[in-house]
Amino acid sequence: MSSPVIHILNGDALGDQFPKDLPGETLVFRECLIEGPRKEVEFEAFFTSRAAYLSDTYDPTIKESYSQELSIPLMKVVTDLKPSEVVLWFEEDLFCQANFWFVCHFLLSSGYRGKVSWAKPSGTARYNFGLLSKESLMAVFEDRLPVDIAKITLLWQASSVNDSDELIRLVEGITDLSEYIIPAALAYRDMNTSTIEQSRPYLSLLEITKTQKTTHFGKAFMAFCKKEAVYGFGDIQVKRIFDKVVAHEN
C-alpha cells in the first residue's frame, strides 16, 4: 500500500494542532534521543534498549506502548506505506534536532528513497511550533525545505558517539541548512563536557540560582527555558541538573 505523504511530528502538542487539511498521514515521534542509549547495531535491538531506558527513566508504561506507538509505525513507513514524500516536522532546538537526525538516519538505513523535506518553524517560533496558528503551520508546510538524508545521517552518527567536533564540522558542510542546525550542534558540544559541572546547562542554572538568589525550581526552570531555549529541555531534564547545582552549592 502506498501513501503519498507521511508527516512525522515532533510531539503530541503539534499533533493536536496539526492542520487537518494537509494531505497524508501523521506519525508522532515520541522520543528523547538527547539522552540514554544511542548506539545501535540493528534497529530492533536499538528500539528495545530505548523502550527500556525511557520506561526506567520516565514512565513504566512506555515499555509496553513504545513498539505499538513508535517503532512499529516507523517501520511501516518504509516497509508498507512507502510514501512518495516524508515531511519531518521538527524545531531547531537540540531536543528536536537529535530526533530529526535519527529519523533521517533510520530512513536512509532502511532503504527509503523517496523525497524527504523539513517543515520547520522560523523566527521567534523556531523552537516552538506552539506559537503558530493552523494557518501558519500550513505556510510552514508550503515553505518546507528539501533534505539530503545522507548528509543528516552523518550528524546522527557523530552525535551518537559524542564526537562534537565532527558534528560541528559536518553541520558546517551542509551549507543550505547549516544556519538552522549549527546552534543545536554548538549546544550539544557545550553540554557534552568531561564533567557535568563544566557543561553549559549546569553553568547556566548555577548563574540563574545566584543572580536570582533562588533555589525555587519553578522560577529557575522558567529562566533556563528563556536563556537556553536552544536545548529544548523539559522540566525533568532541567530538574536533574538543577538538583546537582543546588546540592553542590549547599
Map each language-model feature to its residues.
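Long, hydrophobic/aromatic-enriched structural stretches that serve as scaffold segments
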Residues: Y58-W101
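A short alpha->loop->secondary-structure connector
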Residues: F102-V116
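A short acidic (Asp/Glu
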Residues: D16-K20, R38-K39, C96-C104, Y127-L131
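Charge-enriched amphipathic alpha-helical scaffolds
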Residues: L203-S204, C225-N250
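A conserved mid-domain beta-alpha-beta active-site/ligand-binding segment of alpha/beta enzyme cores
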Residues: L131-T211
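A structured, charge-rich N-terminal accessory region that forms the first stable segment of a protein
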Residues: M1-K63, E69
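Short acidic, hydrophobic short linear motifs in intrinsically disordered regions
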Residues: K213-F224
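Short, conserved secondary-structure transition motifs
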Residues: A119-L137
